[in-house]
Every structure is written in C-alpha cells, then in structure tokens.
Amino acid sequence: MAAKPETKVDTDADEVSVNGRIVKYQRYEYYLFNKPSGCVSATCDNVHDTVMDYITDAVHDDLFPVGRLDIDTEGLLLITNDGALSHELLSPSKHVAKTYYARIDGEVTWDDIIRFKEGIDIGEERPTKPAELVIKKTWQRI
C-alpha cells in the first residue's frame, strides 16, 4: 500500500493494483486506424475532427499519428507513442517504402509514370522524392 502519491514504482518488479484489480504497465501503445475522409492526421485541430478524437480507450496521453494522410484521403494510419518506431518508419535515411492506392478520375499515362519516377514538382522548394507508380486495375464507365 503506497501512502504517498510520489511513491516510485519499479515497472519490472512491483505489482500495482487499484480496487483489487492489477494494473499492468504499458510503455507503448499502438493503434492501426482506418482514417475516414474529413478527418485530419493531427493531435489537435479547432476546426476538423482529428485521428486522436477516435482513440477513446488510450492509456497514454502522448499518442501521435505516424505520418499523415490528407483530409480528403482515407486509409490506414499508425498511431502510437513510440518515437523510436516513428523515426524508423518516417526518416528518409531509413528508406521505408510506402504504398498508396488511389482511384483516379481520368486516364493515367506513361508520362505520369515517368513523372512519378523522377519526382513531381508540387510547388515546394524541391520536387517530391522519386516514387513507383503501378497501375493495378482500371475502372471503366459503362
């Protein structure tokens, strides 16, 4: 029984219980979240729902999304408080490939594939890093 709130706990050796229920220490939390359109990949936003608004059973309050998806984009997003893992996944020096699937309204041409391979100028200081564009399936209007 701890009488002082500042009592230190050894997470490897001590057992902590509250109202008779054992509380297990979790250093990191991991959520694989299917981000809906209209939601921003941020920890807080005064205008839009954030991915964090959907995580209601978190143990830690230091969770963050690993990477981002645009507001109109849907897809899987990792949410964690594991900074080392985030660095391993996001650091350009680690060369972790990312895969995106998109439904395109219009035709994708060979020139588009080449532009992706060379990097695309999106109006920032430098063009995007080279990427592989693969056409998996085409949709036809009937």
Named regions from a protein language model:
Residues M1-I142:
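Basic, flexible Lys/Arg- and Gly-enriched helix-loop patches that mediate nucleic-acid binding at interfaces
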